[in-house]
Regions:
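Charge-dense, helix-prone N-terminal extensions
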Residues: 1-135
């Protein structure tokens, strides 16, 4: 994936907004004001030339540990709470995995919203239907 593909994919989720509170070289993506993806663009104070293109994702502590142990391209996030955030060097990871992790980050943040808001972003599981009768 490239920067534009990541941006387009992340903005495709319901309720996502983007801003640049940390300068022109970083885009943050938010759901109801809560950041769940931070995308480094390069240049400026946060140049990616030495480290490579990356994004930071908010994931559960257990998931962060799991991904860091499986992928060299997933590391504790620079400038974020390392327990809850990982840097993903997305050019070194399959696109489908990057998309899966972005979606996972979105759903994690959505799951922490108040119930009335949460229902808007997390689809309810379908009711089981057996012989045409909802269970």
């Amino acid at each position: 994936m490239n920067i534009e593909q990541i941006r387009d994919y992340t903005l495709s989720f319901l309720g996502v907004t983007e801003d640049q509170p940390f300068g022109d070289d970083i885009i943050t993506f938010r759901l109801e004001g809560k950041i769940f993806v931070c995308l480094w663009l390069g240049g400026g104070e946060h140049d990616i030339k030495e480290t490579g293109p990356r994004l930071a994702l908010k994931l559960s502590p257990e998931r962060n540990e799991e991904l860091r142990s499986q992928f060299e391209a997933v590391t504790p996030a620079w400038h974020w709470n390392k327990k809850h955030w990982s840097d993903v060097y997305y050019e070194q990871i399959e696109d489908t995995l990057v998309q899966e992790w972005i979606r996972e980050s979105y759903l994690l943040v959505a799951s922490k919203l108040p119930k009335a808001m949460r229902q808007k972003y997390i689809p309810s599981p379908p009711l089981a239907v057996e012989d045409g009768v909802k269970k």
